[in-house]
From Swiss-Prot:
Organism of derivation: Homo sapiens
Domain of life: Eukaryota
Nucleus listed as a keyword: yes
HIT-type Zn finger ranges: 11-42
Principal location class: cytoplasm
Gene Ontology terms: biological process: box C/D snoRNP assembly; maturation of LSU-rRNA from tricistronic rRNA transcript (SSU-rRNA, 5.8S rRNA, LSU-rRNA); regulation of DNA-templated transcription; snoRNA localization
Chain residues that bind Zn(2+) 2: 22, 25, 38, 42
Assembly behavior: Thyroid receptor interacting proteins (TRIPs) specifically interact with the ligand binding domain of the thyroid receptor (TR). Requires the presence of thyroid hormone for its interaction. Interacts with NUFIP1. Interacts (via HIT-type zinc finger) with the RUVBL1/RUVBL2 complex in the presence of ADP.
Positions of post-translational Phosphoserine modification: 80
GO cellular component, one term: pre-snoRNP complex
Cross-referenced CDD domains: zf-HIT_ZNHIT2-3
Name of the protein described by the UniProt record: Zinc finger HIT domain-containing protein 3
Record's keyword annotation contains Metal-binding: yes
Disease annotated for this entry: PEHO syndrome: An autosomal recessive syndrome characterized by progressive encephalopathy, lack of psychomotor development, severe intellectual disability, early onset epileptic seizures, optic nerve/cerebellar atrophy, pedal edema, and early death.
Length: 155
């Protein structure tokens, strides 16, 4: 499953374009005000693997190494011939402009679920678990309603 960190990264508090990342958990935020709000609920333990890696790195400046497997699998997915699995640019814009979707994303619990899903190692397992949560199902249904409106109306 592709990472959610593509070109649509938004501030975890106000959903605006972020300028910074939390030093503890690496979630994006756009201002001091948003950082202060985030800091109240920040859980630095959401990134324990990164902490271990950083503590094992030498103290001199080293360019971070990208996860080659993730890059390859994303590239394979993007280059696949399965056009029906791709979301058009127009539908991506529609997702970004949806007031309903934006209001759902204001929920801190849903946002934490999304961060956990994005950062989790077993995304398929997390997705199965999250699809048991009514809030996440509402979010998924909203996204599908925007991306595939005709299929949603038939069911």
């Amino acid at each position: 499953m592709a990472s959610l960190k593509c070109s649509t990264v938004v501030c975890v508090i106000c959903l605006e374009k972020p300028k910074y990342r939390c030093p503890a958990c690496r979630v994006p935020y756009c201002s001091v005000v948003c950082f202060r709000k985030h800091k109240e609920q920040c859980n630095p333990e959401t990134r324990p693997v990164e902490k271990k890696i950083r503590s094992a790195l030498p103290t001199k400046t080293v360019k971070p190494v990208e996860n080659k497997d993730d890059d390859d699998s994303i590239a394979d997915f993007l280059n696949s011939d399965e056009e029906e699995d791709r979301v058009s640019l127009q539908n991506l814009k529609n997702l970004g402009e949806s007031a309903t979707l934006r209001s759902l994303l204001l929920n801190p619990h849903l946002r934490q679920l999304m961060v956990n899903l994005d950062q989790g190692e077993d995304k398929a397992k997390l997705m199965r678990a999250y699809m048991q949560e009514p809030l996440f199902v509402e979010f998924a249904d909203c996204c599908l309603g925007i991306v595939e409106p005709s299929q949603n109306e038939e069911s």
